[in-house]
Amino acid sequence: MSEGDLFLISFLKVGFASLGLNEQLINNIKRYGITKLTPFQMEVIKEIKENSNVIVDSIEGTGRTISLIIGTLDKIDETKQQQEQEQQERQQTDQQFSFPQILMILPTKELSQTTKVIYSSLGGGENNNNDFKVLSCIGGVKISMDIEILKKGNTQILLGTPGRISDLFSRKRFDTDNIKILVFDELDEILSRGFECQLEDIIKPLNNNNNLQIIVSTSGINELTSNFINTFIKIPKIIKSQQEPYKF
């Protein structure tokens, strides 16, 4: 299939089997109303599942965020055995922590909240009851409220704006060792808003984890995004789409 191909694949007939998604996620996707994926979206999900560092370069409206959410959700460790063991060890002290597996940085409060809703809808268990917690941390909300939720220890997907996530990093309010996927959604927009220092504060300590997978979405690669990618992301797979915005 050529890059930017506009024809659609029937997700219900082909995509589930070819992508190897877990059954509960498939059921949630159906319930959410997604019936088709483009070849571009399928390629994004495939590369995420294969643990590649991925740069998704496409205009808005091509379904890239849905692709990121589906791909990362499929990699959640649902057994949570390691998380629960570590949490029990932490509970022997005065501090309690969450052990998020996915950390996603977004440019705006609105996008963070919208993405949280989609993660919650696609990540729910039977009858759409979440077996894990999705937390959106944004400015304008008291940070003490975020900290109280993180102390409960069940946050597996952490979303937020750069300033708030950087603040939580500096306060050491969640365990970073369990993070296996770091996502920068709309990196070009994040950098254009002047958050480069905050992104560095977030990514530098995580880069010590050799198993960390980094995923970026961007609408074009300019000097700012190119410098960031070259500095912090090892051997990324670039997936580029030139197709027109697609509506489900």
From Swiss-Prot:
GO terms for biological process: negative regulation of translation; P-body assembly; stress granule assembly. It holds the Pfam family DEAD. A motif (DEAD box) lies at residues 185-188. The keyword Acyltransferase does not apply. A motif (Q motif) lies at residues 14-42. Residues 45-239 form the Helicase ATP-binding domain. This is Putative eukaryotic initiation factor 4A-like protein. SMART domains: DEXDc. SUPFAM superfamilies: P-loop containing nucleoside triphosphate hydrolases. ATP binds at S58, I59, E60, G61, T62, G63, R64, T65. It comes from Dictyostelium discoideum (Social amoeba). One of its GO terms (molecular function) is RNA helicase activity. Belongs to the DEAD box helicase family. eIF4A subfamily. GO terms for cellular component: cytoplasmic stress granule; P-body. InterPro entries: DEAD/DEAH_box_helicase_dom (IPR011545), Helicase_ATP-bd (IPR014001), P-loop_NTPase (IPR027417), RNA_helicase_DEAD_Q_motif (IPR014014). Keywords: ATP-binding, Helicase, Hydrolase, Nucleotide-binding.
